[in-house]
């Protein structure tokens, strides 16, 4: 049975998928979380074989994070499911609603 992953797990998976080889410090910075809270999430993801840590070749103190096979499959399922839901919602909306939605998304992305 699959373990339940919360929003923190999904955010970490997403960033690791988008930035293969990201190290712990970079991930903490991008997620704006404490090392302690991220460690719990990473422990869960490693135990579930979603991600793997590989020691940095240039700096042995650093560990680089990558999606494992299981993590790649899981990410694709979640991503495709979300993509389908968004596509269907936009397809069944008026052009005015779509424009308003794009404006809201832009504000979210810009942090306003």
Model features per residue range: what roles?
Residues 43-100:
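Charged, amphipathic alpha-helical coiled-coil/dimerization segments
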Residues 24, 42-43:
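Short, hydrophobic-biased segments on the C-terminal half of alpha helices
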Residues 95-112:
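C-terminal regulatory/oligomerization modules of transcriptional regulators
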């Amino acid at each position: 049975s699959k373990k339940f992953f919360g929003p923190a797990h999904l955010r970490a998976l997403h960033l690791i998928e988008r930035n293969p080889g990201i190290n712990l410090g970079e991930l903490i910075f991008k997620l704006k979380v404490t090392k302690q809270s991220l460690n719990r999430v990473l422990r869960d993801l490693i135990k579930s074989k979603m991600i793997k840590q590989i020691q940095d070749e240039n700096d042995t103190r650093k560990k680089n994070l990558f999606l494992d096979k299981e993590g790649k499959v899981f990410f694709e399922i979640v991503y495709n499911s979300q993509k389908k839901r968004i596509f269907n919602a936009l397809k069944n909306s008026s052009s005015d609603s779509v424009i308003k939605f794009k404006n809201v998304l832009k504000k979210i992305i810009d942090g306003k």
